[in-house]
Amino acid sequence: MATIGYFGDSFCAGREPESWCVLLANRLKANIVHWGEPGRSIWSTFFSFERVKHFDRIPDYSVFCWTEPYRLYHKELILSANTERLPHVNPKIYDALDDYWVYLHDYKKDELAYTYSLKHFDNQILSSVKDKTRIVQTWSFRPFETAGRHPNIQLSSGEFIDESMFNFAKSNQGSKSEQAILPDWNNTGLINHMTIEQNQHWADKVYERLSS
């Protein structure tokens, strides 16, 4: 049986039957071997794919949903601005995070590092495995859109859907609902931050690229 892996954040983490990830896998007759990790940075995505590559477990289909640049990497914790403190975690970690955002953080540095690292991953890593896996790349968040900027980053390995899933969900495209979806991130009625109709629409969109 074919395999498919989703690499990214919470926009490709939903395991419900109505999730676009599950719908797409069913249409491809593929077993899901990797899921997105909610709240994680692009560095978590890089490390996840490097692990499957190292152990020669690259799936037949690899779908990447790239998140925003403003998340810090930690191998166990979600760390970004306004991260909720967990009671079992050493509070010094969150104190250090708060200090980082106040005294050390630089948006331009984040954006430059994001652009360079993502292009390197696209041009050097993914291009080297494109004969082993069908690749689709898209945006969970279009780069820097949460900061009000929209640089033109083009990705060349595999199929590139140059659309923001965040914006797709927020604008209610493909949904019967009349109310805005985001930024109600904790709405339990949503899957991958989208309605059931939107999940179906997104599964169709990705399937069309993979079947073309």
Question: Where are these predicted regions, by residue range?
Answer:
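Serine-esterase "nucleophile elbow" of acetyl-processing enzymes
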Residues: 1-46, 54, 195, 201
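Alpha-helical cap/lid subdomain in secreted, periplasmic
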Residues: 50-200, 204-212
